Curated annotation (Swiss-Prot):
PROSITE patterns xrefs: ATP_GRASP
Protein name: Formate-dependent phosphoribosylglycinamide formyltransferase
Molecular-function GO terms, alphabetical: ATP binding; magnesium ion binding; phosphoribosylglycinamide formyltransferase 2 activity; phosphoribosylglycinamide formyltransferase activity
Binding positions for ATP per the UniProt entry: R114, K155, S160, S161, G162, K163, G164, Q165, E195, G196, F197, I198, E203
GO terms of biological process kind: 'de novo' IMP biosynthetic process
Gene: purT
Keyword RNA-binding: no
Segments forming domain ATP-grasp: 119-308
């Protein structure tokens, strides 16, 4: 984009954000720095990104008619999906009518469920993945697990933040894992993917940004998951030059196939020099929150530049850094946080409290960030900061 207008004027450059969580909040802040007018949308009021946007709307984004009506009302220059649960077929239609979807409507459509992206990666692009089968019924699922062998992993084809995912160690876990997958799917009961288990050394997120005709990679991010949901991440993840080159080859291949411009979070399994493709998100990734302290341009700043067609001449990484999630459990519409002075007492630490309006059960409400002389000490420092925060329900 060669020109950015004045927000809230007829010549404003408008971005409509579909999904308004903590990642979207940081994207809005970065777009605001460029004087972009931002409209935040989600299925509930007072979502984090809404709190920093120019205005907001509450709709069911899986309702194609409602989504179309809102976009035709706002006439944004850029439509930026922040989550998967969107009527992506409507985005495809809108793109064909002249709207710009970031990174592309094809990317949003293929990655909204695990089947589309897995078939693209494994069957069309020939990328290495775990062996897999899809199942619509318990009988098909049981047959898939028995064919792939134990241990294996089952996931709903549509879910986020690890919801509905299980590692099956034996046939006695089949029923419980099936029930959990049916509860955790974003669209309710339905199709699952069963994957053969890869005995990997570690898993990484390779943040890959397509911008102004180029592809640039951030340093690899290592992360630890529990029940499929990220708990901590660190950068850089140590890996062999062979494994890093293969990771970049896979990431470049899949993001080129998805097309468009923007930041992608490419998830990979690594064992020695071997690399397997796992998943890709065509947007900033939760494990990439570490870049708020580890890089001169965070993943959110990179996404904003790519959206606007601005150059990214270099990405500077500041050395070992880590993030640790602040997880809250309970019921409250007035969550408070105390002991922040203690949490920030050590040098090179930071906090992000997301401002989510309520917690019901378990919810990620913030993240602690730290830099240090090594990845291990940075992880320890970030964890200390996260644990020092007192949550008041």
């Amino acid at each position: 984009m060669s020109r950015i207008g004045t927000p809230l004027s007829p010549g404003a450059t408008r971005v409509l954000l579909c999904g308004s969580g903590e990642l979207g909040k940081e994207v809005v802040i970065e777009l605001q720095r460029f004087g972009v007018e931002v409209i935040a949308v989600d299925r509930y009021a007072d979502a984090p990104a809404m709190q920093v946007a120019h205005r907001s709307h509450v709709i069911n984004m899986l309702d194609g008619a409602a989504l179309r009506a809102l976009i035709e009302q706002e006439r944004p220059h850029y439509i930026v999906p922040e989550i998967e649960a969107i009527a992506t077929a409507t985005l495809v239609e809108l793109e064909s009518e002249g709207f710009t979807v970031i990174p592309s409507a094809r990317a949003a459509n293929l990655t909204m469920n695990r089947e589309g992206i897995r078939r693209l990666a494994a069957e069309e692009l020939g990328l290495p993945t775990s062996p897999y089968r899809f199942a619509d019924s318990f009988e098909e699922y049981r047959a898939a697990a028995e064919a792939l062998g134990f241990p294996c992993v089952v996931k709903p084809i549509m879910s986020s933040s690890g919801k509905g995912q299980s590692l099956l160690k034996g046939p006695e876990q089949l029923q419980a894992a099936w029930d959990y997958a049916q509860e955790g799917g974003r669209a309710g009961k339905g199709r699952v993917i069963v994957e053969g288990f890869i005995d990997f050394d570690y898993e990484i997120t390779l943040l890959t940004v397509r911008h102004a005709g180029e592809t640039t990679f951030c340093a690899p991010i290592g992360h630890r998951q529990e029940k499929g949901d990220y708990q901590e991440s660190w950068q850089p993840q140590a890996m062999s030059t062979t494994a890093q080159a293969e990771s970049e080859r896979i990431a470049r291949t899949v993001t080129e196939a998805l097309g468009g411009r923007g930041l992608f979070g490419v998830e990979l399994f690594v064992k020695g020099d071997q690399v397997w493709f796992s998943e890709v998100s065509p947007r900033p990734h939760d494990t990439g929150l570490v870049t708020l302290i580890s890089q001169d341009l965070s993943e959110f700043a990179l996404h904003a530049r790519a959206i606007l067609g601005l150059p990214i001449p270099a990405i500077r990484q500041f050395g070992p850094a880590a993030s640790a999630v602040i997880l809250v459990e309970g019921q409250s519409r007035e969550v408070g946080f105390a002991n922040l002075g203690q949490a920030l007492a050590e040098p090179d630490t930071a906090l992000r409290l997301f401002g989510k309006p309520e917690v019901a059960g378990q919810r990620r409400m913030g993240v602690a960030l730290a830099r240090d002389v090594s990845v291990e000490t940075a992880r320890q420092k970030a964890t200390r900061a996260a644990q020092a925060v007192e949550v008041q329900l």
